[in-house]
Amino acid sequence: ASLSLAVLEYLVHVDRDLSPSDLVSIAAAIPNSLLVETVEIGQLPKGWQAPSDQEPLQRLGSEWVRAQTSAVLRVPSALIPVEFNYLLNPAHSDFRRIVWADPVPFSLDPRFLQ
């Protein structure tokens, strides 16, 4: 995961007219000893990248949260499938082991919002 991928994911979902100018980035350090489950592309439903039908993906995420098998789930990015997003489950007991950096303010280059 990277800040640049997070920004891309943000931009495809935000109403650009309502995008705040005072964003922050908070890095997370996940200990090597912490279980990180991974969803491979082959495990995802057909058409998983299509924005029109996200229900199967939402169901997958909800089932992961309910199962409480890990605090972190690594999933392919729909925008750049060779890169990954990390979903965090704050209800999992291992979530407290994740170390958080201080928030770092940043703003988007105005060209992103044109």
Name each model feature, range by range.
Residues 1-22:
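Long, hydrophobic N-terminal alpha-helical segment
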